[in-house]
Amino acid sequence: DYGLFTGALAGYLEKVGAVSTKDPDRDRLIVKSLLTGEANWIIFPEGRMVKNKKIVEKGQFMISWAGGKHPPHTGAATLAIRTEFYRRRLRRLAEEKPDEVEYLMDLFQIESLEPVINRHTYIVPVNLTYYPIRARENILSNLASRLVDNLPDRALEELMTEGSMLISGVDIDIRFGDPILIGECLECTIIESDIRAERRINFDDPVASKSAMRKEALKLMQLYMTDIYNMTTVNLDHLFASMLRFLRVKQIDEGDLRRRVFLAATRIQQHAGLHLHSSLKEDPIHLLTDDRFGIADDFITIALEKGNLQKVNDRLIKDQATFTSAYDFHRARIDNPLDVIANAVEPLTQLQRTV
């Protein structure tokens, strides 16, 4: 996030290898390091961190953020395709056009050609699921506020959320999908023609195959987006939040809510296609008895604090508006964490049908 590249924090981020999203040389640097294999890159496929986790609308990937809605960006796919384009171009022209190869090696600061042309480019889908998600002030957010003048609200929110995860303790489930080899998408005639073209092609020069590569990037994006969100690790917060969102009655007894989540949990355990948090792999009978892990109590406490629920005469009154009203995108995880939690499992059709 370019908003973090200010003051003392900017120097630190540059030293550890982070690149601002507004760095004019960003794409060439990424392609160069992918060609040489000196670095791998972590890229948000949505184009930015989706704090509200709202990435599906009417069955299609659609990102909702402070500026409106848009399909997921194809940045990761485009960079992977551009990398493999130049790798194949170097391989193809190594003997036929040595002067062009020399130019490209200089452009990308490549010292040795052999390792570059013998590598391949992959996209590895990765999913990180945090449990529980609770945003609050912490030592990291306080420190950043002192180091950076006028720290942007969105950066502060990220530090409050991620900082709390690191300091207070949180389970992080990391899942890696099958690597996607970038290669087949470059085999159409028009792209092949540009790869073997003998004319000089500078990094930002327009090429005839630009439209074809754009289409391939869109297909590639759909592939890894599906893989990423299908790897979400389902936890009890997801079930409670989804159950509360879809609850058709306006009020409910706490015991009834817990029984519904218990039933959903036992059914979810039978779905082989879902990834479950360790707590969901065990018998959830505690939801019906003493709630000895405090999971139901903690969820309901948060729901009451954030206004999703009100408690009247031992009954829980649901405020449906908290699941449908617009809210500040950059404060989503602070102001409405339950909506964020429910959004995170929206792409999982098996779970949605069960709930």
Which residues fall in each region the model found?
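Membrane-interfacial terminal anchoring regions of lipid-handling membrane enzymes
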Residues: D1-V355
